[in-house]
Curated annotation (Swiss-Prot):
One function term, GO molecular function aspect: NADP binding
UniProt source species: Bacillus cytotoxicus (strain DSM 22905 / CIP 110041 / 391-98 / NVH 391-98)
Name of the protein in question: Glutamyl-tRNA reductase
Misc remark: During catalysis, the active site Cys acts as a nucleophile attacking the alpha-carbonyl group of tRNA-bound glutamate with the formation of a thioester intermediate between enzyme and glutamate, and the concomitant release of tRNA(Glu). The thioester intermediate is finally reduced by direct hydride transfer from NADPH, to form the product GSA.
Domain notes: Possesses an unusual extended V-shaped dimeric structure with each monomer consisting of three distinct domains arranged along a curved 'spinal' alpha-helix. The N-terminal catalytic domain specifically recognizes the glutamate moiety of the substrate. The second domain is the NADPH-binding domain, and the third C-terminal domain is responsible for dimerization.
One GO process term, biological-process aspect: protoporphyrinogen IX biosynthetic process
Amino acid sequence: MHILVVGVNYRTVPVEIREKLTFQETELKRAMTTLQSQKSVLENVIVSTCNRTEIYAVVDQLHTGRYYIKKFLADWFQLEIEEISPYLSIFEQDGAIEHLFRVTCGLDSMVVGETQILGQIRNSFLTAQEVKTTGTIFNELLKQVITLAKRAHSETTIGESAMSVSYAAVELGKKIFGDLTDCHVLILGAGKMGELALQNLYGSGVQKVTVMNRTFTKAETMAEKYMGHAKPLSELQCALLEADILISSTGSSNYVITKEMMKKVERMRSGRPLFMVDIAVPRDIDPEINELEGSFLYDIDDLQDVVEANRAERLKEAEKIQFMIEEEIVLFKNWLNTLGVVPLISALREKALGIQSETMRSLERKIPTLSDREKKVISKHTKSIINQLLKDPILVAKELAAEEKATEKLALFAKIFDLEVQEEVEHTEELEHKRAWTPSVSSL
């Protein structure tokens, strides 16, 4: 068994590529189920956000697993493997485990220390559990990862100075307009990102806010919460005429605002500039709009400079969390190593209980006058003797599984007790590869 991560993220892949490899939330169940049927894939969780699309998988062979995950991505998005391969980041074994911890703790985010990714990882994990694409390995790993991420944010101050992407969008607006009090802001999309932007706008003193969404009732609910106004999406062109700032984050797979639409709007705006921030992936706004004279469009990758604020302070806290991650990885690997010894221990117990059962049958033949109560007492005490005798050997077996050359040592252990463990030894040989895991990528 091997743990593998394959995907794209904001660090190395621009938004125009990432948006081609983004799963819609409604697709995740079907996507994970489809991936689970691929050769070599034993478990999988897919995480797809505005900054990353990553597949976390347990595979039986690294090379085969890598190929079939790439093939799945290419087939799903109707691309060629050769087209996507140059953009894919791949983490294996130790590197994959550390990457998952770092991502969930917010250390790999554009905004170091942000907490939104924790909820996104958790939701993906719950979805994977629902469609039964996780098993023993990921159920334990994700439980540890999510628990540590919560602890990291409660025991450090990394989240106190961290901005969300939505906050960064508002800060960019402040840099351009200064005081936002008199600005008319249009929020396109009533999801989590849109609401976070609205929260930050409300805190900045914005008084004129219009919310638009595909589902009008959602726009109404969010607008009422922040003393704004809701409009149906059919009135988008009219809303663009009134707005000074647009922040867009819908779940649309196509452009919501096209260049042709903005050409018409600009002619009616009488030279008034429109500042637009597109924080959606895939993008909501046609990037060619930047060619128009009165439209100033920024996408999620343009927010990098804004989120650098307080970065030095957050990196100090990130070092503390990195240390916590390294400790947790050791604990997880120790647990992982014990998996190879579980069948061996089961075989030992089974053999011992078989001897106990045969002994009981022999006693019953030799002493036919034993009452049921006497049989139960004898059985109970002989099992107790077995448990006490097995306690130390089982402890030793677990310790051997975590040591170097575990395969040979456990094979000797099996030979001493005359156990049939061919399958278990092969399983342990797989686990031994974990002691030569590739180093991780640890950049902040």
